[in-house]
């Protein structure tokens, strides 16, 4: 009897009961804020920002005066160097740098240095302040972006244009040549003029030709010279009379 009861009551191996009792425990609540430590509470109370009370409304207060910033010592030094540059050099050209590489810039400096043309870099703010306070104020509109100054003690425009032809990243904007401002077209026209040495040679050859003619005329007979002088006087007198007649006709 007992054996049969035990067999009925005790669960068999591998048998799962139809209903099971599951115990649900209380969940831990973690959303409660921790209380602030009393020392931290004291520190927060002491360091709490208390806005000042205004004695007058904001509209009645006077506006703040902005302090004008003085030029730094570096700006003063660069300004002095720029002033000396305009005094010593006869040709100063302004060009814009359109992202030229460092290697190409080195080659350009080397080509310009062969013709005694120096490449100078100055901050735009310093350059504008100097130009606006000098006789070269008309050059200030050329100073914008990354600018480069090409300076030489003698005007060597043709050599400068030949050197810049290999670097299209350097765009020539204008130049001041012997205290005269030139645009890009003016620089091209100036480069087509003959050099000073050629002009001097032509002048000397013309003067020597005139002196040689004068010497050859002086070697002639005095009667021939007097006849030439009389003819010259007659031509001058006839020219003066024609001029007076034209003036009288215009006045009438």
From Swiss-Prot:
Q: Does the record carry Transit peptide as a key word?
A: yes
UniProt KW Mitochondrion keyword = yes
Single GO molecular function: structural constituent of ribosome
* An annotated GO cellular component: mitochondrial large ribosomal subunit
Could you tell me which Gene3D superfamilies the record lists for this protein? 3.30.70.1730
Q: Where in the cell is it found?
A: Mitochondrion
Could you list this entry's UniProt keywords, alphabetically sorted.
Answer: Mitochondrion, Ribonucleoprotein, Ribosomal protein, Transit peptide
GO process annotations (BP): translation
Transit peptide, from-to: 1-24
Record family assignment = Belongs to the universal ribosomal protein uL10 family.
This protein's assembly is summarised as: Component of the mitochondrial ribosome large subunit (39S) which comprises a 16S rRNA and about 50 distinct proteins.
Q: What is this protein called?
A: Large ribosomal subunit protein uL10m
Classification lineage: Eukaryota, Metazoa, Chordata, Craniata, Vertebrata
């Amino acid at each position: 009897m007992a054996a049969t009861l035990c067999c009925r009551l005790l669960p068999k191996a591998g048998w799962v009961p139809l209903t099971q009792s599951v115990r649900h425990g209380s969940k831990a609540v973690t959303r409660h804020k921790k209380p602030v430590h009393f020392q931290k509470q004291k520190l927060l109370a002491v360091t709490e920002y208390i806005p000042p009370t205004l004695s007058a409304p904001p509209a009645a207060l006077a506006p703040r005066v902005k302090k004008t910033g003085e030029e730094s010592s570096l700006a003063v030094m660069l300004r002095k160097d720029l002033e000396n540059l305009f005094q010593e050099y006869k040709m100063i050209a302004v060009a814009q740098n359109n992202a030229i590489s460092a290697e190409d810039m080195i080659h350009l400096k080397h080509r310009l240095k062969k013709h005694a043309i120096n490449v100078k870099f100055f901050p735009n703010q310093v350059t504008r302040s100097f130009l606006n306070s000098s006789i070269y104020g008309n050059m200030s509109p050329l100073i914008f972006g990354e600018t480069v100054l090409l300076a030489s003690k003698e005007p060597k425009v043709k050599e400068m244009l030949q050197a810049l032809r290999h670097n299209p990243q350097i765009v020539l904007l204008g130049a001041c040549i012997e205290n005269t401002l030139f645009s890009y077209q003016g620089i091209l026209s100036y480069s087509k003029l003959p050099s000073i040495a050629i002009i001097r040679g032509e002048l000397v050859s013309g003067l020597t030709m005139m002196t040689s003619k004068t010497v050859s005329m002086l070697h002639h007979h005095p009667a021939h010279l007097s006849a030439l002088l009389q003819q010259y006087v007659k031509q001058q007198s006839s020219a003066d009379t024609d001029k007076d007649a034209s003036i009288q006709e215009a006045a009438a």
